[in-house]
Swiss-Prot record:
Signal peptide segment: none
Subunit structure: Homodimer.
Protein name (Swiss-Prot/TrEMBL): D-cysteine desulfhydrase
GO molecular function: D-cysteine desulfhydrase activity
Cofactor: pyridoxal 5'-phosphate
Amino acid sequence: MPLHHLTRFPRLELIGAPTPLEYLPRLSDYLGREIYIKRDDVTPIAMGGNKLRKLEFLVADALREGADTLITAGAIQSNHVRQTAAVAAKLGLHCVALLENPIGTTAENYLTNGNRLLLDLFNTQIEMCDALTDPDAQLQTLATRIEAQGFRPYVIPVGGSSALGAMGYVESALEIVQQCEEVVGLSSVVVASGSAGTHAGLAVGLEHLMPDVELIGVTVSRSVAEQKPKVIALQQAIAGQLALTATADIHLWDDYFAPGYGVPNDAGMEAVKLLANLEGVLLDPVYTGKAMAGLIDGISQKRFNDDGPILFIHTGGAPALFAYHPHV
């Protein structure tokens, strides 16, 4: 078993059973290709999402260190911050969130609805900043201040994307390979690539478990030149901690995130509407809508290796739909 070293890392059970892997018959008919979806949007805490996989490892480490406060950072509409705050509430921990407004909007829905509304329900301490220009340093500065107030803080990086957090997606690869036993000739896996932990964890896991399957990361905030080093750095760090080699190339498509992170575009919104209309599945304007736009266009442009089935990793994010109204 190439991933047996995963068991060395403490893990807090937050998700329980594997998330569903489903066939999408109407979308498949529409696109002329078998499409499957991994439903990490339906993880069981606070409207779901992929970050719970990372938090199982990160929060286990925080508890091992005796922390009473989780500190993290992200955009006002960050799904990661929402899930971190929910886990903190569930465990009786304090949560401090350092937030930025990456799109510079004054729209009330964006500033107060969606994920931001949920942060208040979880009694999160909000700290605003002009921009997360150096989030690791900014989080450490905040942690020092919180510690001086008598708390025992644990810093969780943006997106939960450290080598430890990304172990959650190495583990996800184990679920995927088991659930895909009946999927004949799986060709490709498509995932949104942002803070890079989900992408890197899958890259390590799938390289060892499904080496013939192509993994495509659709960027949501950066060009390939900017994103690829981030994914590779995490890929190598994860592999090092698991005593594995990681030689698989990192495949990225950067054609679908413009005009920038957190700003909806037409192709992404059309993908959101298409999945809702055909399958009753809710994507979001920031991550999964743009990743699905890449999948759809990739089929049209024949960018995939072959014509086999494609698996889409649904990382969640639907609460942001309310914040982005009336774009939706």
